[in-house]
């Protein structure tokens, strides 16, 4: 009897092993396809290259001069004779009046560093000049009650810098390119050509010293205006062109947050508790990236907290979340510290900090900084930001100009608390670069202009490559938001959408807590350099479902 059971066990084990090997082989094949279709990884090596046939004749007109627009202008300068950037704000001002989250905490994924290195020569030295750093992409994450830890050196590098400083870096580089012209103003109209297949010219209402109306011929028009979505409005209101309408799907997670730039006195840098207590997570101030990121489960708390060293001698300390009341805004740094302690305890299922050396050290570090700021008479100011709805625009459902593209939030906006906005725009930029390189330019006889032009299929090719690379961010963040109280759903949808993903994510976290290699694989996907399919690797999926029986 025992021998029979042993034979059965052996055969079951062999069959299960073969089945898993087959699944892994199928998954590996699908993954190779997914790397190309759902990430911009294969585009990175081609950044900075020129089209073999030469430059496209005419202007690439870029509406919007923020992060997406500036990066788009850099890429277009390699392919077009001239680039015109239209931006309502003055490029001489450091502040950004039209970007709500300009002074808030920003997360930058590893893909952002890779793209920026590809489009800007000597990017790292420029980054250091502006107070930024390159470090491992360790977010010091606690998801629910689970801390995620990693083997040193197992994570990809990313950049640490404030949004304002990064934008200043990009502005300086854009201004150094002689073929890029920056016009302060707003695009007010687009004019189709006689075939109504493409945009022929763009009308601009200038601002500043000159308030004249300008017109620019457009070899390509890129909407990089973010939530203003100027391209949507201009295309749909262009009469007799037959463009649009384009369905816009939106939901509102009711996100708000507040951030303060906290100076760290020089006398404290080497003696902060997170450094002196010999913790694995922290080494020195010069190598400090994230201090802590805490994302409680929905039933624990609707607030999240993040602390990161941004530029030079400062920490950016933020708190935000879903459908928060006015009382949730920190009024002072002391109030912020109390909120961090409260959120941390809620995320830890009510457990105190006793016995958690890392948690105690972080809280003691914050309190030490608070005391020092009091001694120096410095009162940090928390700046509040309330975000609008998340949305996607379906430009594939109706006719559109063949030389029209849209980059970043002007096409797809996701919940900013996940920190994907800039990286998502840079994925679009890398995709645009690849599509132009792969495009067969048409001669003047096809466009009515001298030199080379874009083919009639260009816009469709861009959207076909762009959508699968960014739409998974919409799907995953939307599914997460639907698990939060107060989220206003897409009309006709229910909170059940995304429930499997939310439950599976908790189970995957359990695996990551026990397996540092799996944790690193998961983070690479979240850093947008590996496909989301990596979260469904058979060995990970099976373990996730097993650990799910114990998931909180």
Give the ranges of each region predicted by the language model.
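Short beta-strand "acidic-cap" motif of Rossmann-like dinucleotide-binding folds
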Residues: 81-87, 462
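FAD/FMN-dependent oxidoreductases across multiple families
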Residues: 323-431, 435-461, 465
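Feature captures the FAD/FMN-dependent oxidoreductase FAD-binding
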Residues: 19-24, 118, 122-218, 224-230
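C-terminal helical "tail/cap" subdomain of flavin- and related membrane-associated enzymes
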Residues: 6, 17-38, 434-552
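Extreme N-terminal leader/targeting segments of oxidoreductases
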Residues: 1-61, 78-82, 91-95, 151
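Glycine-rich Rossmann-fold phosphate-binding loop(s) that bind the pyrophosphate
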Residues: 64-67
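Predominantly flavin-linked oxidoreductase catalytic cores and closely associated redox partners
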Residues: 176-342
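N-terminal FAD cofactor-binding segment of flavoenzymes
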Residues: 75-79, 91-142
């Amino acid at each position: 009897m025992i021998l029979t059971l042993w034979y059965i066990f052996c055969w079951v084990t062999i069959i299960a092993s073969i089945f898993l090997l087959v699944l892994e082989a199928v998954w590996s094949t699908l993954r190779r396809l997914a790397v190309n279709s759902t990430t911009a990884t294969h585009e990175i090596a081609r950044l900075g290259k020129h089209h073999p046939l030469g430059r496209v004749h005419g202007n690439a007109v870029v509406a919007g001069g923020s992060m997406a627009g500036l990066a788009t202008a850099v890429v277009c300068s390699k392919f077009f004779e001239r680039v015109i950037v239209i931006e309502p704000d003055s490029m001489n001002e450091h502040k950004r009046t039209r970007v709500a989250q300009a002074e808030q905490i920003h997360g930058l994924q590893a893909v952002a560093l890779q793209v920026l290195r590809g489009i800007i020569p000597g990017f790292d030295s420029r980054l250091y000049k502006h107070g930024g750093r390159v470090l491992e992409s360790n977010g010091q994450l606690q998801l629910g009650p689970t801390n995620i830890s990693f083997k040193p050196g197992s994570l990809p590098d990313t950049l640490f810098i404030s949004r304002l400083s990064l934008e200043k870096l990009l502005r300086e580089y854009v201004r150094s390119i002689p073929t890029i012209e920056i016009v302060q103003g707003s695009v007010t109209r687009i004019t189709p050509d006689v075939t109504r297949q493409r945009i022929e010219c763009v009308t601009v209402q200038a601002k500043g010293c000159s308030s004249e109306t300008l017109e620019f011929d457009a070899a390509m028009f890129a909407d990089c205006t973010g939530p203003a979505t100027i391209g949507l409005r201009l295309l749909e209101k262009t009469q007799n062109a037959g463009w649009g309408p384009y369905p816009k799907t939106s939901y509102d997670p009711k996100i708000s947050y507040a951030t303060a730039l906290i100076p760290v006195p020089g006398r404290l840098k080497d003696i902060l508790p997170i450094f002196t207590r010999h913790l694995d997570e922290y080494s020195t101030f010069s190598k400090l990236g994230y201090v802590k990121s805490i994302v409680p489960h929905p039933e624990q708390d609707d607030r999240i907290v993040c602390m990161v060293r941004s530029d030079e001698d400062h920490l950016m300390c933020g708190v935000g979340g879903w459908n928060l009341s006015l009382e949730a805004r920190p009024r002072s740094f002391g109030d912020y510290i109390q909120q961090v302690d409260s959120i941390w305890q809620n995320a830890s299922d009510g457990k105190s900090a006793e016995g958690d050396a890392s948690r105690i050290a972080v809280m003691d570090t914050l309190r030490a900084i608070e005391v020092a700021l009091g001694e120096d008479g410095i009162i940090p100011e928390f700046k509040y930001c309330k975000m609008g709805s998340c949305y996607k625009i379906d430009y594939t459902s109706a006719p559109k100009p063949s030389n029209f593209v849209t980059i970043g939030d002007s096409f797809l906006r996701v919940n900013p608390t996940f920190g994907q906005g800039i990286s998502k725009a840079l994925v679009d930029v890398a995709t645009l670069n690849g599509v132009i390189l792969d495009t067969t330019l048409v001669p003047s006889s096809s466009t009515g202009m001298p030199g080379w032009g874009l083919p009639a299929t260009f816009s469709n090719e861009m959207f076909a490559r762009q959508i699968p690379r960014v739409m998974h961010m919409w799907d995953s963040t939307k599914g997460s938001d639907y698990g939060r109280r107060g989220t206003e759903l897409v009309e006709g949808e229910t909170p059940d959408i995304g429930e499997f993903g939310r439950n599976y994510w908790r189970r995957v976290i359990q695996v990551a807590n026990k397996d540092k290699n799996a944790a690193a694989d998961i983070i690479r996907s979240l850093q947008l350099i590996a496909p989301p399919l990596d979260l469904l690797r058979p060995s990970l999926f099976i373990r996730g479902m097993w650990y799910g029986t114990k998931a909180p």
